[in-house]
């Protein structure tokens, strides 16, 4: 799996989301995303997803596990830095010096329609020991099964 750990990489205007930022949640943050990004399609990335209670934790892997989510592309590349900065605040990437980042934003390979594109993703930055694995890799499917 190809991961770049730089925070800003010119030319990457795609965003992959797998949790509460997905369209199925209809959250205020999704409404924000839909203003600055256009839906490109359902997609997947190599990784494992864990149930942290009130939110999911995606962790990158090199094995055959996949996380199901959605790929978005910025409507206006000139607004991308500002828009992604707002999402960084929401995801706990932008923290004070004495705080720990809840998530980290990186570039990863996204599989969509038999193609591979590079996109930003928010990976969980904490410990998932003892947390349930979401085996399907699809948070919406997992939550529907729990009902």
Where are these regions (language model features)?
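Glycine-aromatic micro-motifs
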Residues: 2-147
């Amino acid at each position: 799996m190809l991961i770049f750990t730089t925070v800003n990489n010119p030319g990457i205007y795609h965003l992959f989301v797998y949790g509460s930022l997905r369209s199925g949640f209809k959250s205020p943050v999704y409404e924000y995303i839909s203003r600055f990004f256009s839906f490109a399609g359902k997609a997947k990335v190599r990784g494992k997803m864990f149930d942290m209670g009130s939110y999911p934790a995606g962790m990158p892997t090199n094995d055959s596990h996949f996380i199901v989510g959605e790929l978005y592309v910025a409507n206006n590349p000139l607004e991308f830095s500002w828009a992604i900065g707002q999402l960084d605040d929401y995801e706990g990437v932008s923290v004070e010096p004495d705080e720990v980042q809840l998530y980290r934003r990186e570039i990863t390979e996204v599989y969509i329609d038999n193609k591979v594109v590079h996109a930003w993703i928010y990976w969980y930055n904490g410990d998932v020991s003892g947390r349930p694995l979401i085996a399907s890799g699809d948070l919406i499917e997992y939550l529907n099964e729990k009902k």
